Amino acid sequence: MARYLGPKLKLSRREGTDLFLKSGVRAIDTKCKIDTAPGQHGARKPRLSDYGSQLREKQKVRRIYGILERQFRNYYKEANRLKGNTGENLLVLLEGRLDNVVYRMGFAATRAEARQLVSHKAIVVNGRVVNIPSFQVSVNDVVAVREKSKKQARIKASLELAEQRERPTWLEVEAAKMEGVFKRVPERSDLSADINEHLIVELYSK
């Protein structure tokens, strides 16, 4: 599947917030002007219409999880089909992606790096190699680094970096073993308050 390969910080500047596309070793505002959009007229902040705000929110979430438009729309359709709040369902589906779980557990410094680990067969789920980044992790699934991949310096560095941030409460991680358990489905209160999923629902409901 095609992926965006351009400058990562430019995307964060476009959305005006940290999309966590970089490792987090340094605060993003020390690397770039996060409150200034890229381009010659980046300092100007145009007033957005309702549609513009909805579109920006969708783009922001899509870029956070590194998903292209067609796949994101499919996630929305599935979220809308499920019982409950469509917006919350959407976020739960995105959080349940294997590449995201690998990132959340601290085995990778970014979601892009996590996606690469999965694609390169460095991750096992319940003892079996899974190389599909979009694989949906279920409750009680055990996600671990493959034995022959445990010596990778980047994985060790990512785990050290993960110690500096709070791990999600719906995951249980044993860093020494390089494995973790998807204990429960995250609730909305567990997830970022910086995301307004209602705008995305409004956009796709038109």
UniProtKB/Swiss-Prot annotation:
GO biological process: ribosomal small subunit biogenesis; translation
SS bond partners: none
Tree of life domain: Bacteria
UniProt entry keywords in alphabetical sequence: Ribonucleoprotein, Ribosomal protein, RNA-binding, rRNA-binding
Domain annotation S4 RNA-binding: ranges: 96-156
Signal peptide: none
GO cellular component: small ribosomal subunit
Molecular-function GO term, any one: rRNA binding
Glycoprotein recorded as keyword: no
Role according to the record: One of the primary rRNA binding proteins, it binds directly to 16S rRNA where it nucleates assembly of the body of the 30S subunit. With S5 and S12 plays an important role in translational accuracy.
Family per similarity comment: Belongs to the universal ribosomal protein uS4 family.
Known partners and oligomeric status: Part of the 30S ribosomal subunit. Contacts protein S5. The interaction surface between S4 and S5 is involved in control of translational fidelity.
Designated name of the protein: Small ribosomal subunit protein uS4
Organism whose genome encodes this protein: Histophilus somni (strain 129Pt)
Taxonomic lineage: Bacteria, Pseudomonadati, Pseudomonadota, Gammaproteobacteria, Pasteurellales
